[in-house]
Regions:
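Active-site pocket scaffolds in enzymes
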Residues: 14-29, 113-245
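Extracytoplasmic/periplasmic copper-protein system
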Residues: 65-109, 220-245
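Hard-cation-handling environments
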Residues: 57, 110-112
């Protein structure tokens, strides 16, 4: 599940997302939202005259003990301060501080729509892509060098952090509005009612998973594959039942 992190009200600067550097961002002091498997690098300068902490401020009792204390030397552990803030959303408006994959948005060779849904199946929740569950979901079929565009639409009441293995993609639009300063990621958390348009170059031949990183949703069917023409995986399903992503 996603988490909301607070750095005790200290100003911090986001310097990287999903392994990609971000430059010259403005400092923030609010809650930082991070989705399953998302990576966000931050830098901050601490007040070394007092103890403070990095903590989860999720509305979830299971996260109450997600706290990392930061204790400068010779400081009493009880000297603790807290603040109440709102949240920072690093995907809200894209960013003007990243190196894009595409400086000019090209015409895609292949386009896919991914309607992300949820419904009751045979006694369990099913999480669907275009009303199908894996392995019945339609794969992305590409050849090396293709420019691929995908539109992700969340038609459910759940967040879906969608993760593409083996590739980075550029987020070119949110809710139908083109982004002037697209982000480059390998995971995008699509919230209920949201849509994103992403684009990537098929430049890493293989058989790759594209799935929701809320792993309950992936296990419930929200997964597909990116398959390169001419690539064969020797993987076989053994008696233990392990299946490839």
């Amino acid at each position: 599940r996603k988490h909301f992190l607070r750095f005790n009200g200290e100003p911090y600067r986001i310097v990287g997302i999903d392994g990609n550097p971000i430059y010259n961002t403005n400092p923030g002091t609010e809650h930082l939202e991070i989705g399953p498997s998302e990576r966000i690098d931050v830098e901050l300068t601490i007040d070394n005259t007092k103890q403070w902490q990095i903590e989860s401020v999720d509305d979830n009792s299971a996260a109450e003990n997600m706290v990392v204390k930061v204790i400068p030397k010779n400081i009493d552990e009880d000297n603790q301060s807290k603040t109440t803030e709102t949240k920072d959303d690093v995907t809200e408006n894209g960013t003007q501080y990243m190196d894009p994959i595409f400086k000019e948005i090209p015409t895609p060779d292949i386009e896919y729509d991914m309607l992300l849904g949820a419904s009751m199946g045979m006694g369990n929740m099913e999480f669907t892509i275009n009303e199908e569950i894996f392995p019945e979901t339609e794969p992305f079929e590409v050849k090396e060098g293709d420019i691929v565009k995908a539109t992700l639409i969340n038609d459910s009441r759940f967040d879906h952090p969608m993760h593409l293995h083996g590739h980075y993609f550029q987020i070119i639009a949110k809710d139908g509005q083109k982004l002037d300063n697209p982000m480059v990621k390998d995971l995008i958390n699509v919230k209920p009612g949201e849509s994103y348009e992403i684009m990537f170059k098929a430049d890493n031949p293989g058989l790759w998973a594209f799935h929701c990183h809320d792993l309950n949703h992936a296990a419930g069917g929200m997964m597909t594959t990116l398959e390169y023409q001419g690539y064969y995986s020797p993987f076989d399903i053994h008696e233990n039942g392990n299946e490839p992503e």
